[in-house]
Amino acid sequence: MRSFEHSSVVITGGATGIGFALAKAFGKEGARVMIAEPRQHRLEGAVASLREEGINAVWLTCDVTKSEDIEALADSAWSEFGAVDVLINNAGIKAPNRPVTELDMEDLHAVFDVNFFGMWRGAAIFGKRMVEQGSRASLYSVGSELSFFSSVPNATAYMASKHAVLGMVEGLREEMPDFIDVGLIVPGFVGTEMHAKPVASLGMSADQFAEVVMPQIKNGERFAVSHAFNIEHITERYEAISKVYETYAPRYEGDDEFDVKAMMARRKPG
C-alpha cells in the first residue's frame, strides 16, 4: 500500500465537506496539501484549521469552470511543491431537483460545467503534467452513488453529470500510463453543506467517509467506495442488464466475433 508521507496533494473543492476531510486525511499521513475553490474566506479558514492540526497546507482561489484558473492552480502547485503526486478532482455543485421535462437548460449547463467539465479540465491539465513528470502519481475524481443508480427523486441532472464523470474516469484509465493511478471516488450520502442541516445530520460524516476511502486511494483502487448497502443497488442494475442479455442476446460459441475491444487489440502494431 502506498505511503503519502512527504507527497504533494491538490484538492479542488477542498475547503469544505469531502474535500476538506480528505485534505485532513492526507495531511495526517504527512502530505503537503494545496486546497482550491472560488471563495477566499472559506479557503483561509480551512487552511488555518489544517495548520492548527500541524498539517502543511496552502490555498489558491480557483474556479473550475475556467481553464485558466486550473492552469494557474497547476502552475502554483508545481512551483510550491516541485511536483504533484495526487490530484483529487472534487469540486461539485447541486442541480435543481426538477424532472427532465421541467429543468431549464441553463441549469443543466451550469451543473455540467462544474461537475463534469470542471473535472475534465482538471484531469486534462494535471494529467498532462503528471505524465511529463514521469513519477508515480494518483488522479482521482469524485463521482457519486448517482454515478451508478438513482437514489434521489428528480435529481436527473446531477445524476447525469456524475455518470459522465464515471465515463471520463474509465476512459482516462486506459489513456494514462501505468505509473498514474486513475480512479473514481464514490460517495453515498455524506453529511456536507451541500444538504440542508437537518438532512445533512442523517448522512455519514465527511471525516468517516475519508477514513473509509483513504486506504483505497493508497492502494490505487479503480473505485474508492464507502456506503456498504449501495452494492445492493449497483448489483440490481447489472442483474437487470444480465437478464435482458440472457433473454434476447444469449452467449454463443464465437460470440466475441463483434467484440470491439478484441478488434482494437488485434489492430495494434506488434
Over which residues does each language-model region extend?
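Catalytic loop of short-chain dehydrogenase/reductase
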Residues: 140-164, 170, 174
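Conserved glycine-rich cofactor-binding loop
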Residues: 8, 15-17
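Conserved glycine-rich Rossmann-like NAD(P)H-binding loop of the short-chain dehydrogenase/reductase
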Residues: 29-45
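Substrate-binding pocket helix/loop in short-chain dehydrogenase/reductase
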Residues: 98-100, 104-109
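C-terminal helical subdomain
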Residues: 184, 196-237
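Active-site loop of short-chain dehydrogenase/reductase
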Residues: 7, 30, 56, 83-84, ...
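The beta1-alpha1 cofactor-binding region of Rossmann-like NAD(H)/NADP(H)-dependent oxidoreductases
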Residues: 40-41, 61-72, 105
